[in-house]
Amino acid sequence: MLLVTATACVPVPGQDVPDVRTPLAVVNEMLRLADVTASDVVYDLGSGDGRILIAAARDRGARGVGLEIDPALVAQSAERARRLGLADRLSFRQQDLFEADLTPATVVTLYLSSDLNRRLQPKLLSELRPGARIVSHSFDMGDWAPARTLQVSSNEGSHTLYLWVVPGR
């Protein structure tokens, strides 16, 4: 069963990021870096066309939730998951990521901006369980040092991936 929910979203100036798709080679490396398995629940914040979650479900058996402010992208992602037979593992929600409950996530993926990542850091640290993994494409989190970084090449160029692991409380 595919769940698509819509929540009233009021964009805050400076929070919107352009819809720039993560190259598929980078998607695969993000999932590998986070060591995503079938036992994971992956949350993609700013899920765009759903490609990260679709790869996580299709290739690694994970479940996932995509949070996206653009209703057209939410519908597109949900339809693609349905067509691929992944609707029972994925849900896509039109929701402001600062309003979302992230507590079920074991992995969070991001391709936002350095500013948004830094603003999300307190939420991630307070809502995610110790050991949860966070992977960001291209953008760091200021003074929170990543556990690992990885350089990945694609047809679109070179990409830096950052991995953080939520520490124990």
Question: Which role does the model predict for each range below?
Answer:
Residues 6-40, 74-104:
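S-adenosyl-L-methionine
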Residues 63-68:
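Conserved SAM-binding motif I beta-strand of class I
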Residues 50-54:
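Glycine-rich SAM-binding Motif I of class I
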Residues 39-48:
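Conserved class I S-adenosyl-L-methionine
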Residues 103-119:
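A short SAM/SAH-binding and catalytic strip from SAM-dependent methyltransferases
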Residues 115-169:
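C-terminal substrate-binding/active-site "lid" region of AdoMet-derived donor-dependent transferases
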